[in-house]
Amino acid sequence: MAYAIIEASGKQLWVEPGRFYDLDRLDADLDQSLTLDKVLLVQDEGAPQIGQPYVAGATVQVTVLSHPRGRKVTVYKMKPKKKTRKKQGHRQDLTRVLVESITVGGKVLTANAADLPKSEADIDAAG
């Protein structure tokens, strides 16, 4: 099982080829292909390659699937014995990306054909 740990949107993510992930909103169009080069670790076969801080020559190729919004978070503040109440809601803008491949040292790591989703309906059903 090939995987990489990347830094994207200020967070570290464990990513595998053929799977999709929700990141904070990226400035990219739908079906646009992006290359993420902040790769902290790559594991394929044998010992993992650990970067200091990033693995040299390692990239992760992703495709933008959609720009959904996250679940609503409700923030409620009140002061007891006073008539002070404040209720706010927030929904985070997200970008759903599909990891196409991981490239390290000229070697391209992709998912098996059986692991890839067949259609957009399969992607929506999984997430």
Curated annotation (Swiss-Prot):
Q: List the disulfide bonds.
A: none
Which domain of life does the UniProt lineage start with? Answer: Bacteria
Biological processes per GO annotation: translation
Recorded GO MF terms: rRNA binding; structural constituent of ribosome
| Annotated SUPFAM superfamilies | L21p-like
Which InterPro entries would you find in this protein's record?
bL21-like (IPR028909), bL21-like_sf (IPR036164), Ribosomal_bL21 (IPR001787), Ribosomal_bL21_CS (IPR018258)
Q: Which residues form the signal peptide?
A: none
Q: What are the entry keywords?
A: Ribonucleoprotein, Ribosomal protein, RNA-binding, rRNA-binding
Pfam families the record matches: Ribosomal_L21p
Q: Tell me the subunit arrangement.
A: Part of the 50S ribosomal subunit. Contacts protein L20.
Q: Which family does it belong to?
A: Belongs to the bacterial ribosomal protein bL21 family.
**Known role:** This protein binds to 23S rRNA in the presence of protein L20.
Q: What is this protein called?
A: Large ribosomal subunit protein bL21
Tell me the organism. Answer: Synechococcus elongatus (strain ATCC 33912 / PCC 7942 / FACHB-805)
